[in-house]
């Protein structure tokens, strides 16, 4: 008989079996469920070496999969981030900001990176730059709000060297006062690159702290019920060097979230070069059950990025997008690499689908099982799209619902 490693008893255990949706106890051996039932039934399998956990009536669910997460990049920075989700007021948020600033050693910054909206606060507003500067006058602060804006305190502006001569980047705006000096407010108009690139200039943690940070991030995901995720890559997440920390944790058997990861093109104009290099270095499926290479994406070419800043008009993708994307998708198809791509608006998605169909029609390369949908089905999808988006863009959709009904 298989040695039982773990028994959970006296609980409310969700099985997802329609015939038997809830049980009291579960027995696990070698990472597999071998028995469910009443506590008395399952405890008959216990051995002197079995770990037995009394749930005392608590709920247990199967592990959740997050199909779109930036877990590898996020783990490298998690210990440096101040989280505002669930914070009830601007006053509380500023108090936490001050505490974090007082405990942040130079040259590190205080970073609030998403996960919140002004409508969660009792005041129903954003913190002001004056309030942020008062809470943290000396430690650099970066506060990201959705993919629409970021606030920098005066200390961060000084470290970055932002002044009246600093130009606005393409698709972004540095808000200025009457003297032309930056106020600290950055706007995506609609490109979020101004936000990403600014945050990317903040100091990184030493490698040993990145390891610790990634472990803490995975532990937090576990607390929320997440046991597996598809990593969508990310800007500034270079392969293979920025995967060293997660590979170290995998080699040391310290991963607590299963990860399938995608490779994200990094530099505009060099995306095809990235994929030509990577397709010679690795292949989808490389790895094991815990850590596996998954394919390309979510960025295949920067010219296809339509962002999701709903404060701004929908951007028109440049005419060169189709040619750039077609060359990349054709290469991926020839190499049998699955891919994913980030897209927000149906106008963009239609153009992307046209590229995929064109690649699929070529005799020398074919996308396996490529199916496209007639406009009738696309219109049906558009009617329920907000329900789909809520899965991976909850805070943004919630914000839209509250703000715009």
Regions found by a protein language model. Name each.
Residues 325-328, 339, 348-352, 367-373, ...:
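Extended, hydrophobic alpha-helical segments in both membrane/secreted and soluble proteins
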Residues 42, 302, 354-362:
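Conserved helix-loop functional segments at active or binding sites
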Residues 376-405:
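Active-site-adjacent C-terminal substructures of enzyme catalytic domains
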Residues 1-2, 371:
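Polar low-complexity intrinsically disordered regions
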Residues 3-9, 14, 18-63, 67-277, ...:
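Divalent metal-binding segments
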Residues 249-252, 279-291, 361-364, 385-387:
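Acidic (Asp/Glu)-rich catalytic clusters
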Residues 263-271, 372-381:
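Short, conserved secondary-structure transition motifs
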Residues 78-82, 366-368, 373, 402-405:
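Short beta-alpha connecting loops at secondary-structure transitions
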């Amino acid at each position: 008989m298989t040695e039982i490693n773990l028994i959970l008893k006296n609980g409310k255990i969700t099985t997802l079996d329609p015939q038997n949706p809830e049980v009291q106890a579960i027995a696990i051996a070698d990472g597999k469920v071998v028995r469910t039932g009443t506590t008395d039934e399952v405890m008959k399998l216990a051995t002197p070496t079995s770990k037995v956990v009394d749930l005392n009536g608590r709920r247990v669910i199967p592990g959740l999969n997050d199909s779109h997460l930036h877990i590898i990049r996020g783990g490298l920075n998690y210990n440096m981030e101040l989280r505002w989700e669930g914070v009830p007021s601007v006053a509380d948020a500023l108090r936490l900001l001050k505490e974090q600033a007082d405990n942040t050693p130079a040259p590190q910054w205080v970073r609030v990176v998403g996960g919140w909206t002004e409508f969660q606060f009792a005041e129903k507003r954003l913190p002001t730059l004056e309030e942020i500067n008062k809470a943290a006058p000396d430690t650099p602060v970066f506060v990201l709000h959705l993919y629409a804006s970021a606030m920098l305190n005066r200390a961060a502006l000084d470290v970055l060297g932002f002044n009246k001569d600093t130009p606005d980047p393409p698709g972004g705006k540095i808000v200025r006062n009457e003297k032309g000096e930056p106020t600290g407010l950055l706007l995506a108009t609609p490109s979020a690159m101004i936000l990403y690139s600014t945050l990317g200039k903040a100091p990184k943690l030493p490698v040993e702290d990145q390891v610790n940070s990634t472990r803490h991030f995975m532990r937090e995901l576990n607390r929320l019920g997440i046991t597996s995720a598809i990593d969508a890559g990310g800007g500034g997440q270079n392969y293979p060097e920025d995967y060293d920390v997660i590979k170290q944790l995998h080699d040391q058997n310290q991963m607590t979230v299963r990860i399938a990861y995608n490779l994200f093109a990094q530099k505009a104009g060099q995306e095809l070069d990235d994929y030509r290099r990577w397709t010679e270095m690795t292949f989808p499926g490389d790895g094991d059950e815990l850590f596996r290479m998954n394919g390309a994406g979510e960025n295949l070419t920067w010219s296809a990025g339509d962002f999701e800043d709903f404060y701004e008009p929908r951007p028109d993708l440049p005419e060169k997008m189709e040619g750039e994307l077609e060359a990349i998708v054709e290469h991926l198809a020839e190499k049998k690499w699955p891919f994913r791509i980030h897209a927000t608006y149906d106008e963009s998605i239609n153009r992307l689908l046209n590229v995929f169909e064109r690649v699929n029609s070529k005799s020398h390369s074919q996308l396996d099982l490529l199916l496209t949908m007639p406009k009738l089905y696309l219109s049906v999808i558009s009617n329920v799209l907000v329900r789909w988006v809520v899965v991976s863009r909850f805070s943004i959709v919630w914000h839209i619902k509250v703000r715009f009904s």
